[in-house]
Amino acid sequence: MNKVLIITYYWPPSGGAGVQRWLKFAKFLPEKGWEPVILTVDPEYAAYPAIDSSLVKELPENISVHKTPATDWFRIYSSDKSKVPSAGFAANPQNSLKGKISRFVRGNFFIPDPRKGWNKFAFRKACDLIEKEKIVTIVTTSPPHSTQLIGLKLKKKYPGIKWIADLRDPWTDIYYYDQFYPTCISRKIDSGYERKVLKRADRIISVGSLLKELFAGKLPDIRNKIDVIPNGYDEADFKDIQPAELSGFTITYVGTLSDRYPLTGFLDAITELRKIRDFSLRFVGKYPDSIMEQIKRSGSDEKVEFITYAPHSEAISYMVNSSLLLLIIPEAGDNKLIITGKSLNINSELLPVAFTQEKLSM
């Protein structure tokens, strides 16, 4: 069986959306004749936005997982380790002077991101695995986009290796990029990294056709080496979940919420809904105080439940046991590039969905 080295920062016990894609690929790759070899960061050194220890149980039996230390650059500009940013943390920026300084430091002194503190450790271990395991194919998946620089360096050392760069999100075009206050020099450096990765990778994977077009427009003659492999869902995640008898009409949102997510139209709609029927509203995921205040101002706080974080299986259970699922996309000029993974799980359940962007009609 051919071996493929998968270099990924997010791996169980990391929680959140970023871990799901390659956890599932690693499960199914052996069916296609590929043995995955995982290289990831040791959780003791990692800066994860969330922990989901239940995902450890989903690891394929006998899978080879190699972990290395990392330098935790987040400690340098964040005194509160409990508030480790997720990939989209700037979507809910702290507008205090301290928050703005923190984001400026992040955007101009840690390019492309602070998780690059893992790179030197990962590179050394990757070289060891490539040589000992006779690996000729590697995959780097991002965000964090600093992981792609590991592949860039490996390709330089081993020109004959096949390097596949999996880009789940935009890089310098991500909707919250400007909230790091990057200088012209910082933008140039970061864009340079992005173009080098796009140019030197043997194949590029994106999660959607619009994202493919975005990357294809960065350089001439790279379109033909960009493939689209969408996210999906695993039927096994649903087989042991039995829908319960609902006591009333339940609306559920699962995932991140921030001030960039347009809730006004939805809250206006449920204000009208309250006049004609009883209902309950449930948010499962991280949310700032401002969201709570917005809901309180709408008069809906008596019927709302906030669950700060739930393991993946529990989050799916909340979705299954709902009357209506809410899907919200952040307000941004390029939000068409946002392909939320939860939409695949929503589709798998064939439940009614209320979608909000700027306005919601129910």
Which functions belong to the PLM regions below?
Residues K32, R124, S146-L149, K153-K157, ...:
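Membrane-proximal helix-turn-helix segments that form the acceptor-binding/catalytic region
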Residues L210, I229-G232:
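Carbohydrate-associated surface elements
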Residues V41-K120, L129:
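A conserved catalytic-core segment of Leloir-type glycosyltransferases
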Residues M1-F74, R203, S209-K212, L273-K275:
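N-terminal subdomain of nucleotide-sugar transferases
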Residues A244-Y261, L267-D268:
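Conserved donor-binding/catalytic core segment of Leloir-type glycosyltransferases
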Residues G285, S290-I316:
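Nucleotide-activated donor-binding/catalytic signature segment of Leloir-type glycosyltransferases, i.e.
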